[in-house]
Amino acid sequence: MSKRESAKYKIDRRLGENIWGRPKSPVNKREYGPGQHGQRRKGKLSDFGLQLRAKQKLKGHYGDVSEKQFRKVYEEADRRKGDTSENLIGLLESRLDAVVYRAKFVPTIFAARQFVNHGHVNVNGKRVNIGSYRCKPGDVIEVREKSKQLVIVLESVGLAERDVPDYIEADHNKMVATFSRIPGLADVPFAVQMEPNLVVEFYSR
């Protein structure tokens, strides 16, 4: 495994879970964390520990979003009408880098952020290079013409390990996707259980 690949698995190793469902994740081979003390049996987590872990998993899944940025998303979710935990998932899934990842234009959420930042993506015909850009239902996301033959794109489309969720309509021949609607927790194909309700409890302390 290259240094670059190893770095991408550090979140899996830290949490002891394969949070993206990737076949090469090191936690597929062991059920303990890294380091010389990794094999020690983990004690029962406190309520705070469970809340913190839920936050770390959700942040990690979206590419280790910074605490400042993640809290900002939470605060917006809390201001909106409805269930805060469902709002939180909807806002995170509306990020442009998340949509690019879910559409299978690239293989990982980290690659999606870099892909967007490097200007390979148009939204409604205009280049957008901000991974946290908020997509709205009906937005059309397209890989720019010169980027459609990049190896990372061609390899990702053929990945069998994940499917495109039904709130995104993707045409891999044209490399175009439409963000159809804002999803809820039950709609998102998380590889492990996510508990946004515990994240809400963490920030509500």
From Swiss-Prot:
Name of the molecule in the record: Small ribosomal subunit protein uS4
UniProt cross-references to SUPFAM superfamilies, sorted A to Z: Alpha-L RNA-binding motif
Region (Disordered) residue spans: 17-46
Family annotation (InterPro entries): Ribosomal_uS4, Ribosomal_uS4_bac-type, Ribosomal_uS4_CS, Ribosomal_uS4_N, S4_RNA-bd, S4_RNA-bd_sf
Keywords per UniProt: Ribonucleoprotein, Ribosomal protein, RNA-binding, rRNA-binding
GO CC aspect terms: small ribosomal subunit
Keyword NAD tagged: no
Role noted for this protein: One of the primary rRNA binding proteins, it binds directly to 16S rRNA where it nucleates assembly of the body of the 30S subunit. With S5 and S12 plays an important role in translational accuracy.
Protein family membership: Belongs to the universal ribosomal protein uS4 family.
Molecular-function annotations in GO: rRNA binding; structural constituent of ribosome
Cited SMART domains: Ribosomal_S4 (SM01390), S4 (SM00363)
Lineage summary: Bacteria, Pseudomonadati, Pseudomonadota, Alphaproteobacteria, Hyphomicrobiales
Residue ranges of domain S4 RNA-binding in the record: 94-157
Top-level division of the source organism's lineage: Bacteria
Pfam families per UniProt: Ribosomal_S4, S4
Subunit structure: Part of the 30S ribosomal subunit. Contacts protein S5. The interaction surface between S4 and S5 is involved in control of translational fidelity.
Any GO BP annotation: translation
